[in-house]
Curated annotation (Swiss-Prot):
Residues 332-360, 381-406, 468-484 have a biased composition (Low complexity). GO terms for molecular function: RNA binding. InterPro entries: She3. One of its GO terms (cellular component) is endoplasmic reticulum membrane. Keywords: Coiled coil, Endoplasmic reticulum, Membrane, mRNA transport, RNA-binding, Transport. Pfam families: SHE3. It is a peripheral membrane protein. Residues 41-185 form a coiled coil. This is SWI5-dependent HO expression protein 3.
Length: 500
């Protein structure tokens, strides 16, 4: 504003000066012109000084106004800041109030829900109270009814009590009477027992004497059994030696026949329609002869056990023990070969076993708690030739059929009869060895009969060298059975002929 006023005041001065300058070179003279210029300059200076003073005053006023405006502006700025701060405070307060309002609304909704639930609970409690009041009325009525029933039961119980009390008094009197009578009977029986003590002692003495007599009988029986077993072992050894010799003779006979008739197998196949492997038979026979020996092992008999009673009058639990040195494999082979023997030997063995079972049952009844004799029989250590003989007799079969009568020479018939005799004796002794190994001791007469019959067959069976033509006698029957067994054993097969 001050600049605008100064520009307005200087504008006429400049215009006058321009007019003087424009006029001076043309019309003025040099002397008058300098004075006029000086006057003009003085005038201009005065006007300028006046204008400067005016401008100073104006400037001072404007400065004062500016200071006042600045102070007002500062106060306005302070007021604006205060108002802004107050506005922020009010906004925060408003937000807190709004949050408080929301919290109060939530509390209000929760309280309204709780009020509704309390109202429902109050209604339910009222209904329950009504039901309880009804049930209380029913309970009171039931109580009155039960009270009446209880009074009736108490009255009946009192009556029963009185009745049973009378009955108990009667029973007590009867019991006292029974005790007195029983006491009298007990005294009578006690007197009788005391009078019978002497008779009991006498009976016990006689029983002990009989028991000692039975012990002596059992000792004698076991001694006889051991003697019989020793005899049997000797016979078995003799028979084994004889069977070995017969087997060697048969092997030599077959070798002689092979040397004399090299085509013997073809002839047998042609005549008998039987396929046979003579080399395998010879090999099995030689193997049996080499592996069988009767000189290495001896017969060992175990003495009879002590049967004297102990201090308390009882016999020891282990009276007889069974000891067998024959291998498990040899025993199984011997049993398998013995099971395929003839029916006559199995029948005799079954009879002896049944007699043995009845004898053992009777002995057990006499002994009381004593162990049976068949379970703990005295063991006999027999030579291993039983299993070897049985296996050799089952493997080294002769290929000839005993029922064919006209197609073979004297040597073949003689070999067949020798083999049948050896097979019969092997079957009998094999069955006896099976019974001995499993603890079955037959009765005395049965064992003696078996030994006698077997020995007579083994010694007298060779007389029928040409008996193959008839089926009579034990040798022919056993030959037929042995041939059937040999057909089943697989050593030779029946050839399939074209005219079957």
């Amino acid at each position: 504003m001050a600049g605008d006023s100064a520009s307005l005041s200087l504008s006429p001065i400049k215009s006058d000066k321009a007019a003087v300058v424009s006029e001076s070179p043309v019309k003025m003279k040099p002397g008058s012109s300098s004075s006029k210029v000086i006057d003009t300059l003085h005038t201009t200076i005065d006007s300028l000084s006046l204008e400067i003073a005016t401008l100073k005053q104006t400037n001072q006023e404007l400065s004062r106004k500016s200071q006042v405006a600045t102070a007002k502006n500062d106060s306005f700025v302070d007021q604006l800041a205060n108002l802004k701060h107050e506005n922020d405070m009010l906004s925060a307060l408003l937000k807190r109030k709004e949050r408080r309002i929301l919290d109060l609304e939530d509390q209000n909704s929760e309280l309204s829900n709780s009020v509704e639930s309390l109202n429902m609970l109050t209604k339910q409690m009222k209904m329950r109270c009504e039901k309880l009041s009804d049930s209380s009325m029913q309970s009171m009525a039931e109580y009155e009814r039960l009270k009446i029933s209880y009074d009736a039961l108490v009255a009946s119980c009192n009556e029963y009590k009185q009745h049973y009390k009378t009955e108990l008094d009667t029973l007590q009197k009867s019991l006292d009477t029974y005790k007195q009578e029983n006491h009298k009977q007990w005294e009578t029986l006690n007197e009788l027992i005391s009078s019978n003590d002497k008779d009991i002692d006498t009976l016990l003495d006689s029983l002990n004497n009989k028991k000692k007599l039975m012990d002596n009988i059992y000792v004698n029986k076991n001694t006889k059994v051991l003697t019989m077993l020793s005899t049997l072992a000797t016979l078995v050894k003799a028979h084994g030696t004889e069977s070995k010799n017969v087997l060697g003779d048969n092997a030599q006979t077959i070798e002689f026949l092979l040397e004399k008739y090299p085509d013997l197998e073809e002839k047998i196949l042609e005549k008998e329609q039987i396929e046979i492997d003579i080399n395998s038979i010879l090999y099995a026979s030689k193997d049996a002869l080499e592996n069988t020996s009767f000189d290495e092992e001896d017969v060992t008999l175990i003495n009879s056990p002590e049967l004297e009673p102990s201090s308390d009058g009882n016999f020891p639990a282990q009276q007889l023990q069974k000891r067998n040195n024959v291998g498990n494999q040899q025993t199984s082979n011997s049993n398998n070969s013995n099971n395929s023997n003839s029916n006559s030997s199995s029948n005799s063995n079954s009879n002896s076993n049944s007699n043995n079972g009845s004898s053992n049952h009777a002995q057990n009844k006499r002994k009381g708690k004593r162990t049976p004799l068949s379970g703990n029989s005295p063991s006999v250590h027999m030579p291993s030739m039983w299993s070897n003989n049985s296996s050799s007799s089952s493997t080294s079969h002769t290929p000839f059929n005993s029922q064919n009568q006209n197609n073979h020479h004297h040597n073949s018939h003689h070999q067949q009869q020798l083999h049948a005799r050896s097979n019969n004796t092997n079957k009998s002794y094999g069955n006896l060895s099976h019974d001995l190994q499993h603890g079955h001791l037959p009765k005395k007469h049965a064992a003696i009969n078996n030994i006698t019959n077997t020995y007579s067959r083994s010694s007298g069976g060779g007389g029928g060298g040409h008996n193959s033509g008839n089926n009579n006698g034990p040798n022919a029957a056993s030959n037929s059975n042995n041939n059937n067994n040999r057909r089943r054993s697989g050593y030779y097969k029946k050839a399939v002929s074209s005219q079957t």
